[in-house]
Amino acid sequence: PAFQGVGQRLGTEIESSKDEAATAALKTVELDAVLGGRTPEEETFETRLYQFNGANSNLQERALEVLQYLKVMGDPTVTLETTPGKSAEEFLLDENRPKDVALLDDGRVVEEETMETRLYQFNGANSNLGAERSAEEMLLNENRPK
C-alpha cells in the first residue's frame, strides 16, 4: 500500500491527540484505497500552494496564491509583474495596491489531464478599467499566467 504506516507516524512525529491520530490513519487507508494502492509519486505534480493554520491544525486549508497581477503604471499603460510565493491574503491587505488587478489561483485541479486550476480575478478599489479588461481577456481566452 502506498500510505502504509503514515497514520502511525503522524501520531509520533507531531503533537496530536489519539482521536486525530486515529482519524489520520483512517483517512490514509481511504486515500490508499482511492489510489488503488499505487505509490503517490505516480500522482504528484508541482504545485504553487501552501497551507496555513500550522502543522497541528485539523483544518489545513489551501490558501490562494497570487500568481500574477497587472499593475497600472500610468493611465493606459499596464505591465505584468509576478509575485511568486506571496499569498492572496498578503496581496489583498496591502494598502499600497488600490489600482492593482490580480489573478488568483485556488490550486484545486479542475481537469486532471491538463492539471488546470481555477483562476479568479480581483479588482482593486481604484483599478484601471483597461487592466480589468486585460485580466478578463486572459481568463476568457485561457491564457493562464505561467
Swiss-Prot record:
This is Villin-like protein ABP41. One of its GO terms (molecular function) is actin binding. GO terms for biological process: actin cytoskeleton organization; actin filament capping; actin filament depolymerization; actin filament polymerization; actin filament severing; pollen tube growth. Signal peptide: none annotated. One of its GO terms (cellular component) is cytoskeleton. The keyword Hydrolase does not apply. Ca(2+)-dependent actin filament-severing protein that is required for pollen tube growth. Probably regulates the dynamics of the actin cytoskeleton. It can promote the assembly of monomers into filaments (nucleation) as well as sever filaments already formed. The lineage of its organism: Eukaryota, Viridiplantae, Streptophyta, Embryophyta, Tracheophyta. The keyword Signal does not apply. Expressed in pollen (at protein level). It comes from Lilium davidii (David's lily). Keywords: Actin capping, Actin-binding, Calcium, Cytoplasm, Cytoskeleton. Belongs to the villin/gelsolin family. Binds to actin. It is found in: Cytoplasm, Cytoskeleton. Its main location: cytoplasm.
